[in-house]
């Protein structure tokens, strides 16, 4: 795994533990859906549809999965209920694979320029600043020089929290006083990072989704100002979502996608919820890659998302 700081086995154990509630919920419902049935018929498919929707996979993605299973049943003439788990696993894996982003297996950065700039967006309370802090730690563990920019200048708590993370991880935080222009903070951050040979920059932003026009203009201005320092910036616009909110995360994702172009997703708080199906639905509906998932409180519990490992863990497949 290159310079990734811990072993695959530990990562898989964290993933299994983090998805425990989702797995228990889905497979308990699945067992009830096929109870007393030997073959997959319309009743089983209706029950499966309900299982997926109540597991926060989302209506559109659920209907897509059901249609594919219906086609398979029609083609094979007879499909036993004992085969349903395997078929469902195949279809979920295929859906995630269609979002043809490459899974990263280490914390190396794409591109041949420095620094690599990640603009982080998301509403307050989803774990945005915590995710930035944990990402900073992961990148630092991988030998990267990291800079943080506190461009959420509307909340004193946001700047303060980012500074605490900066101290904890041991990386510089560029900030200005409360109420400053967020674009000015972004400009200063990139200027300092570039001058000091940083490898990666993470910029925190305000999550004021209730004022869409204001947020759209603010993010556009931040991007425009960044380009004055680095024409390629930002390399990534990452939306942080709270996985435990299920369908609310869906709605937030759609609303943010309408405000600015999102290029990657970080889905947090999956360890305390049975709503892990939201990962499948959001990835399918937005056609934006899930890049990171949060599976616990520890620094290393923020993991690079790997589609195959996620499906294998969900269906308890060992390699």
Predicted regions: what they are:
Residues 59-61, 155, 271, 299:
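Short hydrophobic/aromatic residue motifs in ordered secondary structure
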Residues 16, 20-151, 158-178, 186-194, ...:
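Primarily NTPase-proximal linker/entry elements flanking Walker-type ATP/GTP-binding cores
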Residues 161, 181-196, 210-319:
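Conserved catalytic-core segment of NTP-binding enzymes
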Residues 206-208:
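Short glycine-rich anion-binding loops that position phosphate/pyrophosphate groups of nucleotides
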Residues 42, 63, 78, 82, ...:
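Non-catalytic, surface-exposed connector residues within folded enzymatic/regulatory domains
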